[in-house]
Each structure stands twice: as C-alpha cells, then as structure tokens.
C-alpha cells in the first residue's frame, strides 16, 4: 500500500525553507511514499525550483490561503483561519486522501484543530502528546507532554493504553512495560489521581511496572512513561535545560586554555559519538495519540534533518497500523471494565454487623 503524508509546509519557525527541502530529501530516500505539500503554492513552487526538483507524481501541491502564526491563540486559528495550511492538511487526513499529517506549527493550534477536525477515537476522552526520549537502554516513550494539564485517573489509564499500543505497533514489542511517573515508587506515594491511576493500570491487563521516579525516565526503566501534561512538560523542559547547561559547561572547559583545547581535539571522536547518540533531531516528532487519524507535531525550530525524522515517524505509525490497534485495545479495555462492573453489581450486599 502506498502511504500518503500531508505536510503543513507553512508551519514552524522556518516554514517552507525547511519543510519543503526536508520532504524532498525524504522522498528521494523512500520511493514507496507519496506526499502532499499544503500551503501557499507560489512559495512552495519557489522552494522546489531552488532545489532543482523535477515534477513527480509522488509529490503534489494542495493550496491553502492562510497561515497559522506561531504565537496565535488556538481559538483564533480554529475559528478565524478555516483555510490554513494546518487545517487543510488535517482535512486531507479526514477525507482519506492522506494517512497522516505532519506539522511544525503552533502546538496549541494543532491540538485544538486536530481534535476539532478528526475527533477522538471511541473510548478515548482526550488526545495526548507522546515523545521518544533517549535512555541508557535505548529510548522510552513519554506521554502526556502538555496536551492535558489536568487529568483524571481514567485519562492516565487511556494514556497507558495508547502509549503501550504505540510501542507495540512500531517496535513489535508484544507487552511493553509501563511506568507511572510519581514522587516515589511506593504505592502510598502520590496524590489521589495518581494512586487511582496505578490501581486502574494494575487491573488493566497491561504490563504495568508500577510507580517510577523522574530519574527512571533516562535509565530506561520502562518502555512507556505515563504522566499528566503538566508534569510531563515540566520534566521535558527541565531535561532540555540540563542538557544545554552541560553542553555550555563542556565548551567552557575545553576553551579554557591551550592545554584544554588540545584535550578537546583529542576527545573529538568521543564527543562526536556522544552527540550522535543524544542528537535531539533523531527524536523529533511528537505523536498526537487518540485521534481518528495520525498527526505528528514536529518541533517548531526543527531543521531539515529533524523534520525528515518527523515524517518518518508518521510513516512508521501508518505502517504499524497504530490506529486500528489502539481502537482494538480500548475496546478490549471497555469490555473488561463492563464485565468488572457487572460482577461488582451482582455481589450480595454485606449486612452490617
């Protein structure tokens, strides 16, 4: 089956200067993929000419007359820009002309517009943002990263289902492990929502590891880390800040004097290998899970290489049949919940002693 990806060319800090070259580069390396470039035709065609790209049936342009700014409110984007490149790309997924949408645009606008256009899957209350982070053991998937600041225990359970299904769909892991991010491993730790979520996850039939702490994320203790969007976003931004600080300190030390500069040259192969392992561009592309279509949010400041990885993530999710697998797993969970509820109702009431 040929997979078609709709690319919001106008989104992100660099717009078509990054999205168009990144898409062309991806197409050249992946002959089984088709792409629809959505945005202002004149601008897109200008970028294609600059690349010397010749006409191909695998790439077509779909016009959209409006652009969602990176600082616009979700309400403005949703109500006032019905012909934005973001919304048109999502409509292509809704109509079946494309199997996935990739956008580097305004996160809030993409969340709101995606939910409005595509709707959530049956049994899913809220979509969640999932990202891949490097760990000592490889990588882990973390969700939610900011789509939902306030969550119920049931929402966290749904995040666990979606995260586990994402991993099993893409990486062929039959029962990926799930950790619930908490302030301690003990069952008594955490607020009422987290405690209840742990109970639901434990009874869900998923491979629930239990509570994990922040340091477990980068240890790679579990395949999936579940948390609400507030906690997840703070954890992610803190990690980014620590990485920037360490990089800054390292550069300062290597530039301190002639001897340290020489040491830096000697250590260059090791430093280069380290940078490749933690290169954030390889992990670009957050999955917006729980919708009736595949949506990938690229980082707004992504360069060409990073945006290419976001397209690749969208293709992997389509190939893995992620939407079908999530729907099936949620249906199973709903059935289990109904059976459990019926069983509890059938139990005789205890007489007071």
UniProtKB/Swiss-Prot annotation:
This is Phosphate acyltransferase. It comes from Nitrosospira multiformis (strain ATCC 25196 / NCIMB 11849 / C 71). Coiled coil: none annotated. GO terms for biological process: fatty acid biosynthetic process; phospholipid biosynthetic process. One of its GO terms (cellular component) is cytoplasm. It comes from the Bacteria. The keyword Calcium does not apply. Its EC number is 2.3.1.274. The keyword Transferase applies. Pathway: Lipid metabolism; phospholipid metabolism. Homodimer. Probably interacts with PlsY. Catalyzes the reversible formation of acyl-phosphate (acyl-PO(4)) from acyl-[acyl-carrier-protein] (acyl-ACP). This enzyme utilizes acyl-ACP as fatty acyl donor, but not acyl-CoA. Belongs to the PlsX family. Keywords: Cytoplasm, Lipid biosynthesis, Lipid metabolism, Phospholipid biosynthesis, Phospholipid metabolism, Transferase. GO terms for molecular function: phosphate:acyl-[acyl carrier protein] acyltransferase activity. NCBIfam families: plsX.
